[in-house]
Amino acid sequence: MAEFTHFKKDGSAVMVDVHEKPDTYRAASATGTIQVSPEVFAAVRDHTAKKGDVLGVARLAGIMGAKKNAELIPLCHIVPLTNCEVTFTMDEDTHSITAVCTTSCVGKTGVEMEALTGVSTALLTIYDMCKAMDRGMMIRDIHILEKDGGKSGHYIYQKEEK
């Protein structure tokens, strides 16, 4: 089993020192889903939500969330993202909206946390903009889809891993 890297032997938290690691290309994608009512789904799909373009605002919020990851997660490094994209897929049958946040950089540490923070922020924004219509929305299944680069190499999520 791998050791935790964010703790010293005495148990105190520490930001991992990455100064000796080479700058390499890093990329990650994360996903998550929000389950909404038929009313919310229609309002988002038809651009009739009272607060405006829900997915447009959520896309920008997801990008901002990814960029501000190190301000939210205490031991994360500040990562100079070279790209961040947030996309959405709407499933009419299940009244759900799935977000994917893809991030990349050239640096000393990965961008998984930025992708996770981006997708989480996008989904939270959908909730915020639609909560007047449906307080029972459920955010679920947030996880890394894929990551590449660095010492640990390429990873692709396999559903049966859980």
Predicted feature descriptions by range:
Residues 1-55, 60-77, 83-162:
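C-terminal binding/interaction regions
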